[in-house]
């Protein structure tokens, strides 16, 4: 949303309580994103705690603590982006025997069945990943039970790609490098600057980085982060390889159309840049 408002000419300031923006991402990826946001004119204030918000009618005053300093800032509007929760308040569940989880979602099994027979829950209300395409897969799981064999379940979808539509997009699937190391994998890391991709020059957008973590023992892909033009499309190819349990060499040796962002996988997987 910050980039959307920024593109309309709005001055945007991001307040983040963490030491850096995108704390879940690997530092090299986060650094690239923050640099591009800053270049776009977005002001970022990390390690900031908001202490008070005062609505003055036409303006909003924020009182915040950054380090040892107390500050105030005035804005036209404030957008609160601190997460989401299932919207179940109007469903009347208190009149049923449908159980809830400790996080306030409808409790379901891996076939999305609730604690009441013949009642299923799909979408954000069941506490799963809150993405439109996951809700569509929820639908397929339930339809499979009603009209087919009933084999589909949430256990089948361990590989879920995600994309944040920044400029350029940031796409993820599986584990990033830090998570893979923490999980104890014998890890190979592959990286490629977007500047090396011919299609990026065609698009006149050479910002970003491709980064993939591979299990050195099995050669299976553990996860990928793509920060680049068309990353939201390319990530699906890597997700498919992970779902099919293909060794990374299958993507390295594929023949791709040219010029495309996906052909960069040929070069990306040539040589690991980190062995750990």
Language model: regions and residue ranges:
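Rossmann-like dinucleotide-binding cores of NAD(P)H-dependent redox enzymes
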Residues: 1-69, 129-136, 144-179
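Short acidic-glycine loop/turn motifs at beta-strand connectors
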Residues: 56, 102, 216-218
């Amino acid at each position: 949303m910050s980039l959307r408002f920024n593109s309309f000419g709005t001055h945007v300031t991001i307040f983040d309580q963490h030491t850096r923006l995108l704390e879940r991402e690997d530092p090299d990826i986060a650094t690239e994103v923050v640099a591009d946001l800053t270049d776009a004119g977005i002001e970022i204030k990390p390690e900031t705690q908001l202490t008070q918000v005062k609505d003055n009618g036409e303006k909003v005053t924020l009182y915040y603590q950054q380090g040892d300093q107390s500050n105030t800032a005035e804005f036209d509007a404030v957008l609160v982006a601190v997460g989401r929760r299932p919207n179940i308040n109007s469903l009347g569940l208190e009149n049923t025997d449908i159980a809830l989880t400790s996080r306030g979602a409808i409790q379901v099994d891996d076939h999305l069945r609730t604690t009441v027979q013949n009642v299923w829950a799909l979408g954000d209300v069941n506490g799963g990943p809150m993405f439109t395409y996951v809700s569509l897969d929820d639908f397929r799981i339930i339809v499979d039970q009603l009209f087919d064999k009933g084999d589909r379940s949430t256990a089948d979808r361990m590989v879920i790609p995600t994309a944040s539509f920044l400029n350029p997009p940031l796409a993820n699937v599986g584990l990033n490098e830090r998570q893979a190391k923490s999980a104890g994998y014998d890890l190979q890391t592959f990286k490629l600057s977007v500047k090396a991709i011919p299609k990026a020059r065609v698009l006149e957008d050479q910002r970003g980085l491709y980064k993939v973590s591979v299990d050195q023992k099995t050669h299976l892909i553990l996860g990928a982060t793509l920060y680049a033009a068309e990353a939201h499309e390319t990530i699906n190819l890597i997700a498919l390889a992970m779902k099919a349990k293909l060794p990374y060499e299958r993507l390295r040796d594929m023949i791709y159309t040219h010029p495309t962002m996906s052909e960069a996988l040929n070069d990306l997987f040539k040589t690991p840049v980190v062995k750990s």
